[in-house]
């Protein structure tokens, strides 16, 4: 099986990182817009968002119209669609590719140390728990 098929078969095993669900619900409740920009396919992404009750302002997955990360296309499209200024935006990611996308889009990057990426670079904003997001965005 290819990766995409295998990952769809195992999607029910995926669990969110600690505090992510509560914090996303907190953002939504406080009218803070957030989007999902991922390298994962739309079908799997939508399934997981529905499963965990996450309702982002928009969802951006690989497609034929926009270049994927590290290109900034999806981030810039999300900002435009949601009427968010670059100066007000943050992109949370866990890989160097995520950082490069944010840098190319000229938006602030928050490195999630608990994720996949094991990058030794020291980023201006880093979190080891998603709950720390409030401190960075000054909520």
Sequence positions of predicted segments:
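Short, basic/glycine-rich phosphate-binding loops at helix/coil junctions
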Residues: 1-7, 54-59
């Amino acid at each position: 099986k290819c990766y995409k098929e295998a990952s769809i078969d195992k999607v029910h095993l995926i669990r969110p990182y600690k505090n992510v669900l509560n914090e996303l619900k907190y953002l939504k409740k406080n009218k803070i817009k957030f989007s999902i920009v991922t390298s994962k396919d739309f079908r799997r992404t939508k399934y997981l968002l529905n499963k965990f009750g996450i309702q982002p302002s928009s969802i951006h997955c690989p497609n034929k119209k926009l270049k994927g990360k590290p290109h900034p296309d999806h981030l810039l499209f999300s900002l435009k669609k949601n009427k968010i200024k670059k100066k007000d935006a943050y992109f949370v990611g866990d890989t160097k590719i995520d950082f490069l996308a944010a840098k190319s889009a000229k938006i602030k990057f928050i490195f999630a140390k608990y994720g996949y990426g094991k990058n030794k670079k020291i980023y201006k904003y880093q979190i080891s728990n998603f709950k720390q997001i409030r401190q960075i965005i000054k909520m």
